[in-house]
Amino acid sequence: MNDLTRYFTKIALAFLSAMVLFSGCKQDEKKPVAGSEMFVLTKENLQDKIKGGWAGQTIGVVYGAPVEFKYQGSLIPDEQNIPWREGYVKYWWDKKPGLFDDVYTDLNFVAAFENYGLDISQEKIAEHWANTAYHLAHANQASRYNILNGIMPPASGFWKNNPHADDLDFQIEADFIGLMTPGMVNQATEIADRVGHIMNSGDGWYGGVFVSALYSLAFVKNNPIELVETALQTIPEGTKFHNCIADVVKWHQQYPNDWKTAWFELQKKWNFDVGCPKGCFLSFNIDAKINSAYVALGLLYGNGDFTRSVNIAARCGQDADCNPATVGGVLGVMNGYSSIPAFWLNPLKEIEPLNFENTSMSLSKAYEISYRHALQMLEKAGGKIDENQVEIPYQSPVAVAFEQNFEKTFPVYRDRFDRSFTSELSYDFTGNGYIFYGNLVKCAKIDKDYIDRVSKRVGSEVFGLAEPDDPYIAVLDVYIDGTLDETVNLPMKNTSRRLEPHWKYQLTEGNHNVTLKWKNPDPA
C-alpha cells in the first residue's frame, strides 16, 4: 500500500475508452491572354489577393472562436449571436494564442519553403515540422510523434500508423499552398503531395488538396460555384471525399436558397467518423470530408459575399473557426484584401505586425513572403513577369492519386471503461482491431480522486496536455493474444506525446485479448 501510495504521487495512466473495429464487407478582373491559357493580373492585384487570403483566413478563425466545437452535429441557430467588434482580434490574440493554430501551422510551412527553397524535399519539410515547439493535436501530433520516432512520410500520415489520417489537419493548414501557386492548380497539388502526406492520407489528404485548389483557382475565377466544381476535379471520382463534396454541389442545385436543408442532407448521409477515436460514435466530428463540405456550403450559398459566406460556414458547427477561416481566405483571394469590408478588416490590423506564438512570422511578413514565393512559382511554371503585371499560366486540374483509408474497416462499438492502472491492463474483444484512447497523467501535484472525477466527466486529455517539459517516458509492452506485438514509448512532454497508447487494425476476425504492461511505472 505504501508503494502504491508513493507511486500515485508521481504518475498514473488513464485509459478512458477502447474502441473496437472489425471489417464488414472585390472581384478582380482576370483577363485571359488572347489565344493562350494565360491570365493577366497586375502585380498590385496579385499582392492584394495574397494579402486577402491571409487576412480572410485569420478573420474567420477569430469569428468562429467562441463557437469552435461548441455545436457538434447541430446548426448554430440564427438567434445565437456570434460577436465581432473593434479590438476583438487582439482580445483573442491575448486570451488564447493557440486559437490561431491553423494560421501558425500554415506559417511554419511558409518558413520551411523560405529557408530551404521551393524544391524542399518532403523529408526536410517533415524534419522542420517535427521540431516545432508549439502544441499540436490529432493527425498533426500523431505525425510529429511518428517522425520523432523514425516513421517518416508518407508512412507518418498513413492510417495504419496514424488513426487520425482522415482528420482535417492538412485541410486547415494547406492555405499557403494555393497562395503561392496562383492559378497553377497542378503545382498546388504537387506541393500538397509533399506536405500533406506528412500528417494525413486518404480523405484527410484530400481535404488539403481541395483547399489548396480552392485558393489557387480563386486567383483566376470569380464565380464560387465554378470555383468549387473546378477544385473538386483535383479529387479522384469514386472516393468518399469526392462523393461528399459532389453531394453538396447537388444539394445546392436542389435547394439553391436553403442552405440549412442542404446541411441536414449532409448530416444524414455523411456525419459519421470512422477513424478518430475522439469522435467515433460521438457527436464530435473532425473528419475532413464533412468539414470540407461545410466550406463548400459557405462558398456555394454565400454567393461571393464575405460576411454571408463566413457566417454560413461558422453556423454549420463542428470546427467552426477553421471552416470559416478557409472560406474567408478563399474569398479574400477572389475579391482581394482591399475588398474585405472595414467592419472585418479594421480589428485585424491591430495584430498584423505581431509574430504568432512560437514563430518568427507575422501576417505582415506572410504577405511579403507569399507574394515572393508566388512570383518564383510563376517563373518556374513558365509565367511571365513584367514590371507592372504578371501572366499566369492557368492549368486545368488533374486529379491526384486514389487513396481510401479504413477500407473494409469500420467501428462497431465504443466501450467506455474508466480505469487507471499502474502495472498491467488486459482487455478482451471480438473483432479485427481496436484502439485505446487515454492519456498519461502526472499526479505529483494533483489529487488522484480529482483526476478520476474529471477524467470520467470530460476525459483525461486536459491532464495530458499540462506537461510542457517533463522528460519522463513511460514504456509499455503490448501483447496481443499472449504474443508481444510492440514496445511503445509514451512521453510526458506535450510536444513529444503519443496521442493513443496503442491500436491495431486488420487482425484475423474473431476473439482477441490485448494486454498492456507498464515496464517503468515509477520514474523516480
PLM segments and residue spans:
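C-terminal motif of bacterial Sec signal peptides marking the signal peptidase cleavage site
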Residues: 22-24
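Glycan-recognition and processing domains
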Residues: 387-473
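Catalytic phosphate/nucleotide-handling subdomain of diverse soluble enzymes
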Residues: 59, 63, 70, 74-83, ...
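Active-site-surrounding "flap" and adjacent substrate/cofactor-binding loops of secreted or lumenal enzymes
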Residues: 66-97, 103-106, 123-137
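Beta-strand-rich ligand-recognition modules
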Residues: 457-524
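Active-site cavity-forming subdomains of large catalytic enzyme subunits
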Residues: 47, 51, 55, 59, ...
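Bacterial N-terminal signal peptides that target proteins for export
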Residues: 2-12
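Accessory "access/gating" subregions that flank catalytic or transport cores
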Residues: 41, 147, 156-165, 176-184, ...
